[in-house]
Amino acid sequence: MGEVRRIAKPFFPWVGGKLFLLPYIFQLLPRRAPRLLEVCGGSGAVTLGLGAGYAPLRVYNDIDADLANLFRCARDRPLALLRELDFLPLHARADFEVVLRFLNHGYDPNDFLEEELQIAEEYFPPMDRQEVKKLLVGRANLPDVQRAAAYYLSIRYSYSATGNSFGGRSVELRRFLGLLRRASDALQGVVVENKDCCDVVRQYARTGAVIYADPPYLEAERMYAPSFALQDHVRLHDCLCAPAARDSHIVLSYNSHPDILDLFAPDFYIVGFDRPNPMARQEDARYHELLMTNFDPGPMLNRQLSLLDNPGLVSSDRPELRILSAPTGRLPRVWDWPQD
């Protein structure tokens, strides 16, 4: 077995993050692909985890413009992002509310630029004055980085990473620095889009491409913005069944909702497992996690997960995937998976 590769992980908490699902998702993917499309990007766990060597073309997409901007800044300006976070210390609810006002276009930190430059002129000695003014002007010329830092703080310090209520969580700076550095490295060469997921599928899907979709779970992620209603799930289903995507390797993650099962079961294999549900009040409550594929996953379920060789993801006591249903509406494609 080769050298253990330390994978990149999401560098911020995220509602519905899929880090715990990665062993199951990777088990269903080919070893390599010409294209990787993560069309409902969220925390980007799949794109980050597979890394630069997985596909010549990798696309991360999310409909949330602030989230897409955060990924662009992490890819292109990680040091500027870190510096901007130093400008935005967040210690109390009032600080958090200022960040939300900025994100909601009710406050612009550059409104006080002239005043800050004047203060620097009056109170700093000449040598320090020029450095301070240069720093202030340089920061004002990076509105995308300012917004990315504010968005990160709104997630990191909010209750349950919802981005809308102060939770007062502490930050381990050393751990964050490591996460951001590895994420920035993994994002090099990634195309970051801010589009509707179906538009990305139509634009980038090709024969052999891997498409991973993790849409907001129906009636389970009400905190997600923008909303994703049942008709949006129908659009996604129809898009993935259209000719443009039919010859791609498609994997979706979903919750076990009757409307979702009725929608996808005729055209997709459904595999899943149960896990403890810490959010439920009932003791020993279980949560049903589903993965859906447009190919027969049977040959993959017994495949040893050596893609990552990472003991942090592969656990001997994790539940095994089970095939729950096979499509009835058409003859599904059975992929000839490469072993190397």
Residue locations for each model-derived region?
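S-adenosyl-L-methionine
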Residues: M1-E38, A45-V46
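General small-molecule cofactor/ligand-binding pocket signal
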Residues: V191-E193, V271
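Short loop/helix-cap segments at secondary-structure boundaries that form the rim of catalytic
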Residues: L50-G53, R202-R206, I260-P266
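Long, positively charged, glycine-interspersed low-complexity recognition regions
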Residues: A225, L230-D340
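Conserved proline-anchored active-site loop of SAM-dependent methyltransferases
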Residues: I25, L36-L50, Y60-D64, Y152-Y159, ...
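Class I S-adenosyl-L-methionine-dependent methyltransferase module
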Residues: G53-V191, L307, V314-R322
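Mobile active-site "lid"/loop adjacent to the S-adenosyl-L-methionine
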Residues: S165-R169, P216-R235
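Short active-site oxyanion
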Residues: R32-L36, A55-L57, L187-V191, A244-I250
